């Protein structure tokens, strides 16, 4: 009888972390990476955990959600965070790395682990036996076809079209009202009413705002049925007034009158700490995006926890398909990790790899799989991607809005974040002890 091993497909941030976590638990790993035999349009080397965009892993302080996530990962012996700490370069309050040294450090740590065997080949069929799929946003065509067959075509997406998400506490509730169009069903939307003058000012800012240049392999995105709000706007004002900003059936209960235009906000998570801007998928750069959003009545001081994005990205409908263990619901020995699960960002991808790898190892060891507490960043991210609204699921990054609210409301943002961070780290410490 052959020794049990776990397959890990993809040696990006998530796959490298998953392989490391499994190997550290004494289990053999077969790690498959198609580069350099087959390159993606974004990668340039054969190194593991190659950072293809920025060299920053974002904020490092505990008043920053991704900083808290990193600290949780440090306490779980993350190879990605350990390597980043060793290869860091000065970057103020952020953790930035020398990208070549960082990729080299991760590659060496994982390749040289006695329990890891690396195969340089493209996987075109999902293997039998315990497997972690961590193939990232540029999953190969052959494997995408396999995933389509596995999950069903309607549950596999090839691009992000994410609208901005706002912290509920930062919305001026005196300027907005709760109502559904024509009062159908429960009042599920917050509505931001605009006068004609406010709309004109917003419209001019929107059509003149700077957008992110498209990469060659992303240019097909807009033709797949999802139009950025600024592209829609450039077709004329009426496109918005008859589209996402349509005021019909949304009379303001304070005045009894129909506003000139309305921006709708839809609840984004079960606890109601986050709202997304309906129909506002966008390709605007983040600075101009914030300026445009803050022209919307009620959102003058909006805290944006996830900016609108549109780019090439292969990901699955995790709320329908995954458990918070990152385990596939219909096949208990199959796990997904990284951006393919709908987490967004370098650190978040590695974090998903950590949890998936940990649980794949526990499955092989016949141990109970772990679900991290939702008071931790690791747990709140797993909770979000597996409980978000499956009808309009879009990738999410780490942010404090994912955590359950504190028992006592703290108005000062810095103090609130510090308190949430303290609770998260206490939770992870207690949880790790029990594991």
UniProtKB/Swiss-Prot annotation:
It holds the Pfam family GIDA. It is found in: Cytoplasm. The keyword Flavoprotein applies. The keyword Heme does not apply. GO terms for cellular component: cytosol. This is Methylenetetrahydrofolate--tRNA-(uracil-5-)-methyltransferase TrmFO. Transmembrane segments: none annotated.
């Amino acid at each position: 009888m052959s020794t049990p091993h776990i397959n890990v497909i993809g040696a990006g941030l998530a796959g490298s972390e998953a392989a490391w976590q499994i190997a550290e638990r004494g289990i053999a790993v077969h790690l498959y990476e198609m580069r350099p035999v087959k390159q993606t349009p974004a990668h340039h080397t054969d190194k593991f955990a190659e950072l293809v965009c920025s060299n920053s892993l974002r904020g490092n302080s505990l008043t920053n959600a991704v900083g808290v996530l990193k600290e949780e990962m440090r306490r779980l012996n993350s190879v990605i965070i350990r390597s980043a700490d060793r290869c860091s370069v000065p970057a103020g309050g952020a953790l930035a790395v020398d990208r070549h040294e960082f990729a080299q450090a991760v590659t060496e740590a994982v390749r040289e682990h006695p329990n890891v065997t690396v195969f340089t080949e493209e996987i075109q069929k999902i293997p039998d036996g315990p497997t972690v799929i961590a193939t990232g946003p540029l999953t190969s065509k052959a494997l995408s076809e396999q995933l389509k067959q596995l999950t069903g075509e309607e549950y596999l997406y090839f691009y992000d079209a994410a609208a901005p998400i706002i912290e509920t506490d930062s919305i001026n509730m005196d300027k907005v009202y709760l109502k559904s169009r024509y009062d159908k069903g429960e009042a599920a939307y917050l509505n931001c009413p605009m006068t004609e003058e406010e709309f004109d000012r917003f419209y001019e800012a929107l059509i003149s705002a700077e957008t992110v240049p498209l990469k060659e392999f992303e240019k097909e995105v807009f033709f797949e049925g999802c139009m950025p709000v600024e592209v829609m706007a450039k077709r004329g004002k009426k496109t918005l007034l008859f589209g996402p900003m349509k005021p019909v059936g949304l009379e303001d209960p304070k005045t009894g009158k129909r506003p000139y235009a309305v921006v709708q906000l839809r609840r984004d998570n079960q606890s109601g700490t986050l709202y997304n801007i309906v129909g506002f998928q966008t390709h605007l750069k983040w600075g101009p995006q914030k300026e445009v959003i803050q022209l919307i009545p009620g959102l003058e001081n909006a805290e944006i926890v996830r900016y609108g994005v549109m780019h090439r990205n292969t990901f699955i409908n995790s709320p329908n398909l995954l458990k918070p263990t990152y385990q596939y619901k219909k096949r208990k020995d199959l796990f997904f990790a990284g951006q393919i699960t709908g987490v967004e960002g370098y650190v978040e991808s590695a974090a998903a790899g950590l949890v998936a790898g940990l649980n794949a190892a526990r499955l092989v060891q016949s141990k109970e799989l772990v679900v991290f507490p939702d008071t931790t960043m690791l747990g709140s991210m797993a909770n979000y991607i597996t409980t978000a609204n499956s009808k309009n699921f879009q990738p999410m990054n780490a942010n404090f809005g994912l955590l359950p609210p504190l028992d006592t409301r703290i108005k000062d943002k810095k103090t609130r974040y510090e308190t949430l961070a303290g609770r998260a780290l206490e939770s992870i410490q207690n949880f790790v002890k029990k594991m």
